[in-house]
């Protein structure tokens, strides 16, 4: 951490941004270490320092919100997590379960669905927001409405196993309605299921989960979600 600070101090403006981003990740790790010692105030200080270094330090927001929630600061926790949606909408799914759980604790049945709908309106290809809202509705006795969202989600990403799991939950609740099952079969006839793989842009290391540091090349924040495109499917079919 000290070495990285010295490098940041000596770097030009372009390199300083990169060094500060790495320092932010290191500050977040220090915060997590403080949490293992039950030093919440120290952890919060590290997470806040990370955000000051890099306003896009997603892990710092996630962990800061988690501490705020544990300390009973529910409104503050939600506000912190919502910053993730603002600064990195492609990572919004990381706060879905958190926000849904806290708003449920608060007795607010509208805030989370409204959030998902805003994200869907802002990005028509956001399959994760549709999945989150579909799962929310399915667990609250609205399987038909859930399936509409889940089928839309499948159109954008028919290969994600997480969608199919909730679809079957909703179909079971509808006693496997023939028309709905037929629609599901049409959408998934060519699908190959996988569990949300991620790949490091630096060294191509593959992971089934989002990692903040690559275990192979050790670079920070290099993982992106790998998607199977129609072109790739066509190439696979012809080979």
Predicted segments, located by residue:
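Hydrophobic/aromatic packing residues within the alpha-helices of TPR/SEL1-like helical repeat arrays
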Residues: 4-7, 47, 81, 116, ...
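Flexible helix-coil transition and linker loops at the boundaries of alpha-helical arrays
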Residues: 8-20
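Start-of-helix register in tetratricopeptide repeats
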Residues: 18, 25, 59, 93-94, ...
């Amino acid at each position: 951490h000290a070495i990285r600070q010295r490098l940041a101090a000596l770097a030009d403006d372009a390199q300083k941004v990169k060094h500060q981003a790495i320092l932010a990740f290191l500050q977040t790790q220090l915060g997590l270490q403080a949490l293992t010692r039950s030093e919440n105030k120290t952890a919060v200080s590290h997470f806040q320092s990370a955000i000051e270094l890099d306003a896009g330090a997603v892990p710092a927001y996630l962990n800061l919100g988690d501490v705020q929630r544990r300390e009973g600061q529910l409104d503050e926790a939600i506000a912190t997590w919502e910053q993730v949606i603002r600064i990195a909408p492609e990572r919004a799914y990381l706060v879905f379960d958190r926000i849904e759980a806290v708003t449920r604790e608060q007795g607010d049945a509208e805030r989370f669905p409204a959030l998902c709908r805003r994200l869907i309106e802002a990005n028509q290809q956001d399959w994760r927001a549709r999945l989150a809202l579909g799962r929310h509705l399915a667990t609250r006795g609205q399987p038909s409405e859930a399936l509409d969202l889940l089928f839309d989600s499948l159109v954008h990403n028919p290969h994600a196993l997480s969608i199919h799991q909730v679809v079957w939950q909703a179909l079971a609740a509808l006693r496997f309605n023939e028309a709905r099952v037929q629609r599901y079969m049409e959408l998934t006839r060519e699908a190959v299921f996988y569990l949300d793989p991620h790949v490091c842009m630096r060294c191509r290391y593959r992971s089934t989960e989002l990692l903040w540091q690559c275990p192979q090349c050790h670079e920070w924040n290099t993982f992106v979600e790998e998607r199977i495109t129609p072109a790739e499917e066509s190439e696979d079919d012809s080979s």
